[in-house]
């Protein structure tokens, strides 16, 4: 890859990528295309930065839900949601409380919305007490499995600047191990 323009919410620069799979004879047997972007995100000296520049989060939570169709959210509704967010100067959306349909990330990449991608780890009833699932070693595998599925599926969307390990899970060994796993993959 040569010189590229970095992706950001202000300038969502995307590039076309094409992958060609060839057999042993050199014949193309499969072609896959995708839009990709290039950016960095980090927390440095207590400040979130994208491409080395400070970012102020102006965000909302979004559930994949429609008042008329329930958990089925059409592409048209997703596009309407994006437009409403942009019209209201929103620059970040959290996928509450589970990873969203991949089309949502494609829209965020295209229109320039930062994403906090949230794994479907949740344990409201147990929260932060001694009985929290996050403190029970028997649940480490489940926490890590859900986080890994999210990261592996969504790792190539430049709009994702933060991985959320879950919602109201409490703290404990399960969250610590999931954090280490995600950090080892995307540091």
Question: Which positions does each model-derived feature cover?
Answer:
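Active-site neighborhood of glycoside hydrolase catalytic domains
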Residues: 110, 134-187
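Solvent-exposed loop/turn segments at secondary-structure junctions
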Residues: 99-101, 121-123, 167-171
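Conserved short-loop catalytic and cofactor-binding motifs
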Residues: 66, 96, 131, 135, ...
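Secreted/periplasmic carbohydrate-active enzymes, especially glycoside hydrolases
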Residues: 1-107, 111-115, 146, 161-162, ...
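Aromatic- and acidic-residue-enriched carbohydrate-binding clefts of CAZyme catalytic domains
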Residues: 58-63, 71, 118-155
